[in-house]
C-alpha cells in the first residue's frame, strides 16, 4: 500500500 501517496493526497486536499 502507498500510505505516503494517500497522506500526500489528503494533505494536498486540505
From Swiss-Prot:
User: Any keyword Secreted?
Assistant: yes
Q: Where in the cell is it found?
A: Secreted; Target cell membrane
* Tissue occurrence: Expressed by the venom gland.
Residue numbers of Leucine amide PTMs: 14
GO terms of biological process kind = defense response to bacterium; innate immune response
Note the superkingdom of the native organism: Eukaryota
Swiss-Prot/TrEMBL keywords: Amidation, Antibiotic, Antimicrobial, G-protein coupled receptor impairing toxin, Immunity, Innate immunity, Mast cell degranulation, Membrane, Secreted, Target cell membrane, Target membrane, Toxin
A GO MF annotation of the entry reads:
toxin activity
Principal subcellular localisation of the protein: secreted
Respond yes or no to whether keyword Transmembrane helix is given for this record: no
Q: What is one GO cellular-component annotation here?
A: extracellular region
Sum up the protein's function in the record's words: Linear cationic alpha-helical peptide that acts as antimicrobial peptide. Has antibacterial activities against both Gram-positive and Gram-negative strains. Has no activity against the yeast C.albicans. Shows moderate mast cell degranulation, as well as leishmanicidal activities (IC(50)=36 uM). Has no hemolytic activity. Its mast cell degranulation activity may be related to the activation of G-protein coupled receptors in mast cells as well as interaction with other proteins located in cell endosomal membranes in the mast cells.
Q: Which family does it belong to?
A: Belongs to the MCD family. Mastoparan subfamily.
Query: Can you say what this protein is called?
Result: Eumenine mastoparan-EM1
Q: Which organism is it from?
A: Eumenes micado
Taxonomic lineage from the root: Eukaryota, Metazoa, Ecdysozoa, Arthropoda, Hexapoda
Amino acid at each position: 500500500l502507498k500510505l505516503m501517496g494517500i497522506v500526500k493526497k489528503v494533505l494536498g486536499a486540505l
